[in-house]
């Protein structure tokens, strides 16, 4: 739309969702950027104090970039997610500037802006995105007009977890750089590692690190190695599940050199491309709001003043991505009929009657952590597959087991992710209901780990499984599955209803578990 965004036009972007107030101008490239971060004298960020900082610094920050007001074609602002007081301060300023300059207002999702500035800065087109910041930790991918969330933190964001640990040891805010510096002098210590499918949980890890009596450098090393390995694992799982070939790291925690190194190694092993934007575009910044506002404006996405309320819980998957017209791809790699297949955690040799699943070492993980996970998961998988089968749950027959390898029956059928339909998803619901009825949670319920055969859905890949009759564990199990369906299908509600029908038909405790799953879903918000 050349009349809306002429060649010499600029978009003014205002970012202020949390601690950093930032303004930028974007045309064909970044023209100007100025920021004023709020640094608390002690402890963490207090929302009211951050908003007061933004209000007092707004005039100076905007005036530093707004040198040619006649060229402004729109004012973009971070509409959410974020801290309510900070969002309100920025939104008020954006509305005033929109009126004063007589230009449209564009409301930008903060999370999507991180992704879009990353795509612009790296040239990546359709990546799996690891978005790691203070309050947000998500794995995203694009499909048919929206960014879909493959997995996310179930409690606190990675950056906030690092800050919480840093405060407990009187380290400066933000805590990530200080932890990274101390970790260079440390040695590995074992800490809790919590991955649930493509979701993660950091609170137990952070609490254990805070309570550790080990030298601070060692705790920082163990904390980084554990938290980042969790992030890379779920990113690899999304990459393997979706069949994409690019990984993009965005968000403030993405500035950490060790996290970048681990992702780069993982991508090299998988033959995928990896990229991270320059540091300017990683933390919260006005450039990402201005750029995303620009491409939204070019596609006619503007916001009437009377609809410009802030959205503190605004999720990336709520945004209609009108500026991307391609459908996006998932499952571009077809099903394996034989030979060797590579999943996120293992190499699988598919024979005529047997499957040999061998867990391979991950070069991105610290060796001691890698050995521990391989041993624990191999033992647990074989034991729980056999236990579930004895209880009547459709699973493969276990033939043999070693320290890192399981030989099992080959299930000849269709992998569920290639044949998703209400009738097949109902079978999945029945299988999971029976599994939960035996006191086992799968831990990685995705459509990659289910095979439809002879009117049954066979459950495979029990590497993250555990024995539990807790409603919480079962609810998280279902949340992982529903998140997978929502991120990779267009008829999610219909499929979810079919799953619930099958699950409820065989499991008496289904109602309580489904209610808990909804609670878990609501936790996946800006924290």
Swiss-Prot record:
Gene source species:
Methanoculleus marisnigri (strain ATCC 35101 / DSM 1498 / JR1)
**How does it associate, per the subunit comment?**
Component of the KEOPS complex that consists of Kae1, Bud32, Cgi121 and Pcc1; the whole complex dimerizes.
Q: Where does ATP bind?
A: 340-348, 357
This chain's protein is named Probable bifunctional tRNA threonylcarbamoyladenosine biosynthesis protein
Q: Where in the cell is it found?
A: Cytoplasm
The family classification in the record reads:
In the N-terminal section; belongs to the KAE1 / TsaD family. In the C-terminal section; belongs to the protein kinase superfamily. Tyr protein kinase family. BUD32 subfamily.
Task: Look up the record and report any one GO term of the cellular component aspect.
Answer: cytoplasm
Cofactors required: Fe(2+)
* Annotated catalytic residues: 444 (proton acceptor)
Q: Does the keyword Kinase apply?
A: yes
């Amino acid at each position: 739309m050349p009349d809306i965004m002429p060649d010499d036009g600029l978009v003014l972007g205002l970012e202020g969702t949390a601690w950093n107030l930032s303004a930028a101008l974007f045309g064909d490239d970044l023209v100007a950027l100025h920021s004023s971060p709020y640094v608390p004298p002690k402890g963490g960020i207090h929302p009211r104090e951050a908003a007061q900082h933004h209000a007092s610094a707004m005039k100076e920050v905007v005036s530093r970039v707004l040198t040619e007001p006649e060229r402004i074609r729109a004012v973009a602002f971070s509409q959410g997610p974020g801290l309510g007081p900070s969002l309100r301060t920025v939104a008020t300023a954006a509305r005033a500037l929109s009126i004063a300059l007589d230009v449209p207002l564009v409301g930008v999702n903060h999370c999507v802006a991180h992704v879009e500035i990353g795509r612009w800065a790296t040239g990546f087109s359709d990546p799996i995105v690891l978005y790691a910041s203070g309050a947000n930790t998500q794995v995203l991918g694009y499909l048919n007009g929206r960014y879909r969330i493959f997995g996310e933190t179930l409690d606190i964001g990675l950056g906030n977890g690092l800050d919480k640990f840093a405060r407990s040891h009187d380290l400066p805010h933000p805590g990530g750089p200080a932890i990274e510096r101390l970790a260079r002098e440390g040695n590995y210590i074992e800490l809790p590692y919590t991955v649930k499918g493509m979701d993660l949980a950091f609170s137990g890890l952070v609490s254990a690190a805070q309570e550790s009596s080990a030298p601070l450098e060692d705790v920082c090393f163990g904390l980084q190695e554990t938290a980042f390995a969790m992030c890379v694992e779920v990113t690899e799982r999304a990459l393997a599940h979706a069949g994409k070939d690019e990984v993009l790291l965005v968000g403030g925690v993405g500035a950490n050199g060790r996290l970048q190194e681990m992702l780069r190694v993982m991508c090299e092993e998988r033959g995928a491309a990896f990229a991270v934007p320059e540091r300017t575009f990683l933390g919260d910044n006005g450039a990402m709001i201005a750029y995303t506002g620009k491409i939204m404006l070019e596609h006619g996405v503007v916001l009437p003043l009377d609809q410009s309320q802030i959205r503190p819980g605004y999720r990336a998957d709520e945004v209609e991505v009108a500026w991307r017209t391609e459908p996006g791809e998932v499952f571009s790699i077809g099903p394996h009929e034989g030979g060797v297949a590579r999943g996120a955690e293992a190499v699988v040799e598919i024979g005529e009657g047997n499957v040999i699943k061998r867990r391979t070492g991950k070069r991105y993980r610290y060796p001691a952590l890698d050995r521990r996970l391989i041993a624990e998961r191999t033992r647990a998988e074989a034991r729980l597959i056999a236990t579930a089968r004895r209880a009547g749950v459709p699973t493969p027959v276990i033939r043999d087991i070693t320290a890192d390898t399981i030989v099992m029956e080959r299930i000849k059928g269709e992998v569920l992710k290639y044949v998703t339909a209400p009738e097949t998803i109902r079978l999945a619901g029945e299988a999971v209901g029976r599994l939960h009825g035996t006191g086992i949670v799968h831990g990685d319920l995705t459509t990659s780990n289910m095979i439809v055969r002879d009117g049954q859905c066979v459950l495979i890949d029990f590497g993250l499984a555990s024995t539990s009759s807790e409603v919480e564990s079962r609810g998280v199990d279902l949340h992982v599955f529903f998140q997978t369906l929502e991120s990779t299908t267009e008829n999610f509600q219909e499929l979810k209803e079919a799953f619930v029908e099958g699950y409820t038909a065989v499991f008496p405790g289904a109602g309580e578990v489904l209610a808990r799953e909804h609670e878990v879903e609501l936790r996946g918000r800006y924290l």
